[in-house]
Amino acid sequence: MKPRVLYVTHRVPWPPDRGDRIRTWNILKFLAQRADVDLVCLADEPVSAKTRKALEGVTRRLAFVPHAGPRRYVRGALSMACGRTATEGLFESRQLRSIVKLWSSNAEYTAALASSSGIARFVQPPYVKTAGRVWIDLIDVDSQKWLDYQSSSRFPMSTVYGLEGRRLRNLESKLASDVDRM
């Protein structure tokens, strides 16, 4: 019996036409050659039939969670106001949580993998109940990106970017100690 992997991505990995999509697509192909992969992705644009077909060809189970519009920015601001990162709020999704919980209750995963720090919580308890290993692929270190924005911006955005960068750095450090691979 093949291992079973849950892969949660912050964007649809097809078509592989830019950095993060190229990376997540290559990881997905690699995993699919070795395991049965259940893929759930946030979709910030409509998913075409061609995209669906390409991803169905390499997954056991597939779900797209619509994730566009101004409400995500409100969630990001509220998250930041509550002491978390804006990134975590931007990627918050009740539907994503529900799918992960449902799939996890019906399958025993050998591993669970998330494609960014902003969605890392979705591959850890209490959302995933049965993952042997938890992996997080930061793709790029978002905390450094925000700290770089801080140094090239003026007040008040420099303050916001700096706060996000520091909070994300703390989150990334915590994840490094909480998960099996990063």
For the regions a protein language model found, what residue spans apply to each?
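N-terminal subdomain of nucleotide-sugar transferases
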Residues: 1-64, 105-107
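Acceptor-binding helix/loop patch of EC 2.4 sugar-transfer enzymes
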Residues: 10, 69-90, 134-173
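A conserved catalytic-core segment of Leloir-type glycosyltransferases
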Residues: 41-106
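Short, well-ordered alpha-helical microsegments
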Residues: 47-49, 117-123
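Short N-terminal targeting/anchoring amphipathic segment
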Residues: 100-120, 132-135
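A short beta-strand/loop micro-motif in the catalytic core of glycosyltransferases
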Residues: 112-113, 172, 177-182
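Helix N-cap/beta->alpha junction signal
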Residues: 116, 138-140, 182
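A short helix->loop->beta-strand "cap" motif at the edges of active sites that frequently abuts
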Residues: 129-133, 179-180
